Amino acid sequence: MLSHRLSALAGQGWAQRILLPWAILGPLWAQVTIRGAVLDKEGDAVVGAIVRLLPTNKGTLTNAEGLFSISGVPPGEYTLQVTAVGIDTLRETIKADARRPVITLKLTAATSAVELSTVEIIESATPAKIDPTRVTVAVTPIAPRQIYTLPSFGVPDVAQYLQVLPGVVFTGDQGGQLYIRGGTPIQNLTLLDGAIIYSPFHTLSLFSIFETDILRQVQVYSAGFGAEYGGRISSVMDIRTRPGNFERFSGRAYATPFVAGALTEGPLPFIRNSSWILSARQGYIQQATPRLYPYLKDSLPFQFQDLYGKVTFGRGPDQLNLFGFRQTDRVDLGAQGVNSWQQWGAGGFFTNLPQASRVRITGSFAYSRFQNTFESPFELRPRYSEIGGFNGGFTFSYLFGADELAYAIEVRGFSTDFLFTNGLGFITQQRQSNTEGASYVRYQKVFRQETLSEEGTPTFFTRAIIEPSLRLHFYNNYGYLSVEPRLRAKLNGRRWSLQTAAGRYVQNWVSAVSDRDIVVLFQGFLTAPEIAANAQLSHPLQEAYHLTLGGEYQLLSAFLLNVEGWYKRFTQLTNINRERLFPEDPTFITEIGYAYGVDLALRYQTPTLSLYGTYSYQYNRRDDFRQVYFPLWDRRHTANLVGSYTWGPWQNVRRGRERRWEASLRWTLGSGLPFTQTLGFFEKLLFIPNGSQNPYSTQQGILAILLSPHYNAARLPAYHRLDLALKYRQRLSETLLLETTVSLLNAYNRPNVFYIDRITARRYNQLPIMPMLGLTLLW
């Protein structure tokens, strides 16, 4: 055909010179792109499915969102075949026509009856397989089923599962904090369906604000995250909720000694392919502990409430979601005071896969607000902190076979209101509004795509993935444009992979809590202050650089070993000035520091047994230009072992299949955290700056503590704990399932130290042995 076109054009002079390139390129432009999404019967993405275009040798794998794209298809008739473990093979007849350059498909796969038991294995825990479709270094995906296999404090919660991840340090059960690979809580970005969450954990730190059963997936980026995330310098926790049941009304209700809750979901009436989901839970720990655990020296004065609702319109890649949430938390310390906070927000997000275009469009907009108050008779005024604002944006992504190009625009605006008075009467107050704009571009290049055998299985995985990205983040209040290059890359073999990630990160927010406080109840948020003592700085923002190297190896069919080394350089940090004595002293100081470590994780998975073990070595240093010290979360060694075993007959209900019995355990070991030793006490005279001071010769001063000049030079004893759980499932009817869970926390009653009161020398331990019984009804 092409030769005939060239012959017809011969001898036509100028027309030949103009039309010849079009004649050559015409057949190339006539090629078609076939793209789409592969979903299961619940509307969730089928990840890693093999998509082949028969009878050609073209093929690819679905990505993390179930999407695929096959380009360069000549006009003609083909059969698109989709295969994956646990689903029936899909075959779709495709007619490629040059008049329709892009063909968009939405494929729904039915569960394979033959592979049903295998499906249960995959759902019960993350498969012990290397993911060939994306760079996974410094990323831990958490599925709800993984959380449910962990022995829990009354009810399974993502906060408890985060504690067993490599690189995570947890400082205590009551008011403790979560530190991810050398970063503080304020340096961790938490997103709920795209909305910024200011306080992801309750004061009783074993509970997050997220009901486990509404979660679709949690992605924890512990270092080296890409340009799609910004505004934080250490880590990201991206939480996505699932839609409600599209087919029928269903739900669950549960009761434990500390928490009770319910979740309901179902299709919206009169609107096709739509659903709703609503969850609520109430913590009544303060009321329950005196009756159920009379041996506790101190009650647990905690109360909290979590509410979440969501409606979904559409299934698969074309979808609109609207959601709202509210959380409250209260700690009554009696004579010491009362700390309470509330958090609420609402928003929406959508995804769209246009039929006649190669682009995929996603967008989101959300508003959230957090208020915290602490009232104590020992303080002149109540502490108060409030932060709230909006964030939103649009992302446009293109699939070119296995390659992907994405770019986005974002906008954020928030305001802060902070008031704090210290013991000398010095007031720290800030009211400020900020606007930020950002844009990023990310390109994922697959240098060598997998070749598919005749049986439809990969002969070898994708050999190399390079994912450079660039984020431009403009801070309007400071007139500062932050240029943040990022890079993620992966090299795959048959049974191994090598990965790396690096980047520059900047953030605006500062915590009003000192990094040197162990117990944190009051949470204050401020924007980055101008620090007069460091006027030579080019900007007041916090800044860090990351480098991560990792490798995976498939030991056997059921073992997966992951090893990662990481380094974070904090070139500019802002902290509370604990040495402030006079009004002219700065409220904040600048610090620098670094953190590095090595994390090992080994996962073993069979149909009935799941084992997950981790070990972390971590080293943290800070320099406040007075001294170099270890921060309080500098735990040198951490080890975790999590296991679960299921047995007994299957309990079949509409919601799925479950084994009747399940036993699980969790054991944690951590070396001692650093602390500053007490040298003695002295009488401190008060000199009030307003001139009305008492004569020092007759004044009765206050008791003050003389601390060692070497900050955090000593270590607390090591921490270790064993938790056990046994679960029994009984089918009550075709649609009802009753779960009974008996758990034992701190099974051998290890007295792990939390902190020691310096004045009274009283030791406060973390939670002792605590047996629990929980009931859950599912329908």
Model-based region annotation:
Residues 56-67:
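Short, acidic Ser/Thr/Gly-rich low-complexity loop/linker segments typical of extracellular
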Residues 120-225, 236, 242-243:
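Periplasmic N-terminal accessory/gating domains of Gram-negative outer-membrane beta-barrel systems
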Residues 303, 656-661, 668-702, 716-723, ...:
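C-terminal beta-signal and adjacent terminal beta-strands/loops
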Residues 39, 44, 49-54, 83-85, ...:
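Short, acidic, small-residue-rich periplasmic hinge/interaction motif at the N-terminus
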Residues 566-569, 588-672:
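Gram-negative outer-membrane beta-barrel transporters
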Residues 371, 493-547, 565-585, 666-679, ...:
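Surface-exposed extracellular loop regions of Gram-negative outer-membrane beta-barrel proteins
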Residues 389-393, 430-440, 536-540, 546, ...:
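Outer membrane beta-barrel strand-and-loop segments of large Gram-negative receptors
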Residues 35, 258-282, 295-330, 335-367, ...:
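Transmembrane beta-barrel wall of Gram-negative outer-membrane proteins
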